[in-house]
Amino acid sequence: MKFWTVQKYATLNTVLKQGIYQPDFSKSWYASQGEDNADFYDCVRKYFNHANETGYPGLVFAFAQNKTNKYIEEFTSYVEFYQFIGSSKNAIKSLWKQIATPDACVLELEYDTTLFNPLFIDINDFQALMPPVMFMPPYTEENLHKVAENFYNGVIAPSVFPSYLIQAHAPFIKRENIVGVYPIFDI
């Protein structure tokens, strides 16, 4: 399945030189922005490792789509990804400002998802779980607990507030995972 991710060119260079990029949250600038953020991203890592019975030190965050709130689909081209991100501006604007830097690029990745559970989650649900957790409509304490439970167990369920932009998680980027490299863009 194809995933799309925003990464620094340094990450791409690591893959090209060493054959693999293995994320490590203990060394991540983004994951270390405040104790709550560090704890949250460590929790996401633990969820992934629980669902996959692995012990990875970090994860690659990537995107897929869900046009119907039922089935996860891949973006088939850079143009489709670009247009979908643009149309999802309200859901992703804050995150995009942080990751779409001049030293970043868009990577088109291919993974065999029969080998691992990518812990798919709607970006709105993921952001609702981020600290500080606040129960704001349409999220209630009950349905947010269900979102967290499903995420922990690697179950994708329809979102109560669907953006149709799906966050996926991968354990690494290997040279053979890279299908294409594209310029970053503003939204």
Residues of each region from the PLM?
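Conserved NAD+-utilizing ADP-ribose enzyme module
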Residues: 10, 23, 56-58, 67-187
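A structural signal for short, well-ordered beta-strand segments and their strand-loop junctions
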Residues: 3-5, 61-63, 108
